[in-house]
Amino acid sequence: MAEKLSEQQIAEFKEAFSLFDKDSDGKITTKELGTVMRSLGQNPSESELTDMINEVDVNSDGSIDFPEFLTMMARKMKDTDSEAEIAEAFKVFDRNGDGKISAAELRHLLTSIGEKLSDADVDQMIKEADTNNDGEIDIQEFTSLLAAK
């Protein structure tokens, strides 16, 4: 995944890595990660820091080296791209821009692409995605729906 990064991105990530790596030993420890996160206004617990490190710590040494950092950043960028795509798709459905997809909006879109569904079918689609039972689909429900596919 890190192989999809440009030379410029890698150089920028090397600079960021150096900011985290306070003692310049080529590794980011939970202590160093915590220091940087706190300086950015975050307040992670020790276990959260350990979890963050373990998520990308391929060689299980309890710290993040630069290749592991690149992998983590490439994943984050990929997630961000797909989040942006999901948000764009959501806007297509959310015609009035109120942050929710109503049955009427879903019905309109499906009709405009040639789908012939009954009101009951559209209501059932909304019901399946509507986890908070407010009769509409919000961005979180929409994202969960797409992630389940």
UniProtKB/Swiss-Prot annotation:
Pfam families per UniProt: EF-hand_7 (PF13499)
Keywords in alphabetical order: Calcium, Metal-binding, Repeat
One Gene Ontology cellular component annotation held by this UniProt entry: myosin II complex
A molecular function GO annotation: calcium ion binding
CDD domains according to UniProt: EFh
Domain EF-hand: 8-43, 44-79, 81-116, 117-149
Keyword Kinase listed: no
Binding site for Ca(2+) 2: 57, 59, 61, 63, 68
Binding-site residues, Ca(2+) 1: 21, 23, 25, 27, 32
Residues binding Ca(2+) 4, per UniProt: 130, 132, 134, 136, 141
InterPro entries for the chain: CALM/Myosin/TropC-like, EF-hand-dom_pair, EF_Hand_1_Ca_BS, EF_hand_dom
Binding-site residues for Ca(2+) 3, renumbered to this chain: 94, 96, 98, 100, 105
Known role: Calmodulin mediates the control of a large number of enzymes, ion channels and other proteins by Ca(2+). Among the enzymes to be stimulated by the calmodulin-Ca(2+) complex are a number of protein kinases and phosphatases.
Family to which the UniProt record says this protein belongs: Belongs to the calmodulin family.
Note: This protein has four functional calcium-binding sites.
Protein name as it appears in the record: Calmodulin
Organism field: Candida albicans
UniProt gene name: CMD1
